[in-house]
From Swiss-Prot:
Gene: petB
Cellular component, GO annotation: chloroplast thylakoid membrane
Additional note from the record: Heme 1 (or BH or b566) is high-potential and absorbs at about 566 nm, and heme 2 (or BL or b562) is low-potential and absorbs at about 562 nm.
HAMAP family associated with the record: Cytb6_f_cytb6
Name under which the protein is recorded: Cytochrome b6
Reported function: Component of the cytochrome b6-f complex, which mediates electron transfer between photosystem II (PSII) and photosystem I (PSI), cyclic electron flow around PSI, and state transitions.
Lineage: Eukaryota, Viridiplantae, Streptophyta, Embryophyta, Tracheophyta
Membrane topology qualifier: Multi-pass membrane protein
UniProt subcellular location: Plastid, Chloroplast thylakoid membrane
Subunit-structure text: The 4 large subunits of the cytochrome b6-f complex are cytochrome b6, subunit IV (17 kDa polypeptide, PetD), cytochrome f and the Rieske protein, while the 4 small subunits are PetG, PetL, PetM and PetN. The complex functions as a dimer.
Residues engaged in binding heme c: 35
Membrane-crossing segments per the record: 32-52, 90-110, 116-136, 186-206
Disulphide linkage map: none
Length: 215
């Protein structure tokens, strides 16, 4: 086993990377509230794992979506547990994200030189909210249907471009198969990809600049 480790160590300098990670200075004022971002990340990883598991059974069509969710909850092995964990971690992710944003704002973590860290964090917060909106529609139940109908109907109040925006969001004049397809694609591919990209921008900046000082 040591020979395998030595082979990788010679080429990748694994020990140096590990030392850099474990020896990072943590300011004495840091408390549990500074862990909210990490908890949000953990919830996101749980979401990815459980969401991926459900894609094996979920069918994104208006005629089969609700039945496929019922199948996950009643027939698929541990489906009820996977979907429940997905829902619970989704709620936890939103809550932790909100608390994290408030903590950063109240402790002045958005100030120079961390402006870009703040901007990427705000984008991640918007993406988190978008996960909630798109995911809510996927079971194709009454609550999800009317929630999506109301949310996608909000831009209609905008003069001139309101109606085209609504049709762009829904895929048609009304909430239907095109809407479900759009939201499923956003929820399972576009939003996770964008979230991963902005996380890869967000975390290195935190690593480089360190944790902000106390007020």
């Amino acid at each position: 086993m040591s020979k395998v480790y030595d082979w990788f160590e010679e080429r990748l300098e694994i020990q140096a990377i590990a030392d850099d990670i474990t020896s990072k200075y943590v300011p004495p004022h840091v408390n549990i509230f500074y862990c909210l971002g990490g908890i949000t990340l953990t919830c996101f990883l749980v979401q990815v794992a459980t969401g991926f598991a459900m894609t094996f059974y979920y069918r994104p069509t208006v005629t089969e979506a609700f039945a496929s969710v019922q199948y996950i909850m009643t027939e698929a092995n541990f489906g009820w547990l996977i979907r429940s964990v997905h829902r619970w971690s989704a709620s936890m992710m939103v809550l932790m994200m909100i608390l994290h944003v408030f903590r950063v704002y109240l402790t002045g973590g958005f100030k120079k030189p961390r402006e870009l860290t703040w901007v990427t964090g705000v984008v991640l917060a918007v993406l988190t909210a978008s996960f909630g909106v798109t995911g809510y529609s996927l079971p194709r139940d009454q609550i999800g249907y009317w929630a999506v109908k109301i949310v996608t109907g909000v831009p209609e109040a905008i003069p001139v471009i309101g109606s085209p925006l609504v049709e762009l969001l829904r895929g048609s004049a009304s909430v239907g198969q095109s809407t479900l397809t759009r939201f499923y694609s956003l929820h399972t591919f576009v939003l996770p990809l964008l979230t991963a990209v902005f996380m890869l921008m967000h975390f290195p900046m935190i690593r480089k600049q360190g944790i902000s000082g106390p007020l």
